[in-house]
């Protein structure tokens, strides 16, 4: 049992908040296995019901960053990631957008996990697409160098999360960890597109990013979704060293067809994988348009284009030139090669075990 966590719980119950340093220590206790499941559940739900403060989230993120397994990434690598837990049921838009951005020539270190509160997390859909999700630091760095894309499966790079994972799954609702994942990319990306589904949290999240420091980050939000939507409810917070600026994003003004979030509904990982394949194959419609919009944000935050209009055009050209499909083929080949290598190692190990003494 952690005394620090117990003291933090008393503070929260009394209506108080944790300072940055206090939050850093508390999350360190959690990550190091010092908190009991009951303490962790109480902490997460107390914060969820009250709302996490900027200092609390920044302190938690710093503790997690101190314990992450680092990945060497090319200069200019970015991440596109949502906090999840928005309940919208859309297909994996940020994952599809990340593939398009990588296909356009911007390295993407995609940090994510399996589904906690939805049917399909980024790991689930990439696995269904035949893309490798079991990278370690060495293979992830190699994939970023060779293909321009690597998926960083959170449990592989945040081993300390094993102490929190079971409790998080049992709770089954959005917690502070949904917000912390995007803030703790193992590649240390300083340019990111971070999606937040909760309108009340989006501005606060931008403040957290600014507090932690960033070269350039976009915090994006739509009506109930953690992506830029097609219903003209999009909001984008530009976060940089000098502060935060807020911008409305109107899909209709960018030449995209307005539609409701319901038309972007997803399903299982297999169903969402087919939806992403359709986008990469160039199928027209709402799914393509929402991927173009969110990929445009990624290209803009990377400095590859000058504005969202240019990003939409670049993303469309990337898809229509077959570059998205080509990247998918390379990533699938990488997965097959890794699977063969793993099978060979297992066979060799079995042979050694079965050899006579």
Q: Model segments located where?
A:
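A glycine-rich phosphate/pyrophosphate-binding beta-strand-loop-alpha-helix module
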Residues: 44, 91-147
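Short glycine-rich or small-residue beta-strand-to-loop segments that form or flank ligand, phosphate
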Residues: 13, 44-48, 79-84, 298-301
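N-terminal glycine-rich anion-binding loops that anchor highly charged ligand groups
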Residues: 1-3, 10-56, 62-73, 290
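Glycine-rich anion-binding loops and their surrounding alpha/beta cores
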Residues: 3-4, 11, 18, 66-69, ...
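Active-site cofactor/substrate anionic-group-binding motifs, chiefly glycine-
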Residues: 51-112
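N-terminal small/glycine-rich loop or linker at the start of catalytic domains
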Residues: 2-14, 79-83, 109
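Acidic, glycine-rich active-site loops and adjacent beta-strand->loop/helix elements
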Residues: 82-87, 112-118, 157, 223-225
């Amino acid at each position: 049992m952690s005394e620090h966590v117990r003291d933090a719980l008393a503070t929260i119950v009394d209506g108080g908040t944790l300072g940055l340093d206090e939050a850093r220590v508390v999350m360190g206790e959690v990550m190091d296995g010092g908190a009991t499941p009951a303490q962790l559940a109480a902490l997460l739900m107390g914060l969820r019901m009250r709302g996490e403060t900027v200092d609390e989230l920044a302190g938690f993120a710093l503790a997690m960053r101190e314990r992450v397994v680092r990945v060497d990434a090319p200069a200019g690598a970015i991440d596109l990631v949502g906090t999840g837990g928005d309940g919208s049921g859309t297909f994996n838009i940020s994952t599809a957008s990340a593939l398009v951005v990588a296909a356009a020539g911007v390295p993407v270190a995609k940090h994510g996990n399996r589904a906690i509160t939805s049917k399909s997390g980024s790991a689930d859909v990439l696995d269904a697409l035949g893309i490798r999700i079991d990278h370690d630091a060495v293979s992830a760095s190699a994939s970023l160098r060779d293909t321009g894309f690597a998926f960083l499966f959170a449990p592989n790079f945040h081993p300390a999360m094993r102490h929190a994972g079971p409790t998080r799954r049992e709770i089954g609702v959005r917690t502070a960890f949904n917000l912390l994942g995007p803030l703790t990319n193992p590649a240390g990306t300083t340019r990111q597109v971070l999606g937040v589904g909760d309108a009340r949290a989006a501005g606060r999240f931008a403040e957290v990013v600014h507090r932690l420091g960033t070269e350039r980050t976009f915090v994006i939000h739509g009506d109930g979704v953690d992506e830029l939507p097609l219903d003209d409810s999009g909001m984008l917070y530009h976060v940089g060293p000098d502060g935060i600026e807020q911008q409305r994003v109107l899909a209709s003004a960018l030449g995209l067809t307005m539609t409701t979030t319901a038309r972007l509904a997803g399903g299982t990982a297999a169903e969402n994988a087919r939806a992403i394949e359709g986008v990469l194959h160039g199928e027209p419609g709402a799914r393509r348009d929402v991927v173009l919009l969110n990929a445009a944000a990624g290209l803009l935050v990377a400095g590859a284009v000058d504005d969202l209009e240019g990003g939409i055009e670049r993303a469309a050209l990337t898809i229509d030139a077959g570059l998205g499909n080509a990247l998918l083929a390379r990533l699938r080949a990488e997965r097959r090669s890794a699977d063969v290598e793993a099978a060979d190692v297992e066979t060799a190990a079995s042979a050694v075990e079965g050899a006579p003494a």
